[in-house]
């Protein structure tokens, strides 16, 4: 659990830095990879992943990250995202770059 909290803290710090570097951008974050999503499609571990997503969202909230600056995404296939926000948003160029950076730093 301690290691899990450390990872979440690192992810929160990274999202906060992206927000600071990209004023006005909406940052897209995912709590699992495309490979993990393939497992979800088989019906495995869905509850576990949703719990991880909730923990991350709660950590972002505690860290003072504005909800309107972050949208959670599930990777469905290359180039297509199913948004898990209350409203759907189109990602601007800065957010696409931030999302790519987040994925690269969390493989």
Language-model-detected regions and their locations in the chain:
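Extended, charge-biased low-complexity segments
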Residues: 2-46
């Amino acid at each position: 659990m301690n290691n899990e909290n450390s990872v979440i803290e690192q992810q929160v710090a990274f999202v906060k830095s992206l927000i600071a570097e990209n004023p006005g951008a909406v940052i897209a974050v995912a709590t699992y990879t495309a490979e993990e999503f393939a497992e979800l499609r088989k019906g495995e571990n869905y509850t576990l992943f949703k719990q991880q997503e909730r923990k991350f969202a709660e950590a972002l909230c505690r860290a003072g990250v504005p909800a309107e600056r972050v949208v959670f995404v599930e990777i469905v296939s290359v180039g297509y995202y199913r948004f898990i926000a209350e409203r759907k948003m189109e990602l601007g160029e800065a957010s696409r770059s931030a999302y790519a950076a987040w994925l690269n730093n969390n493989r």
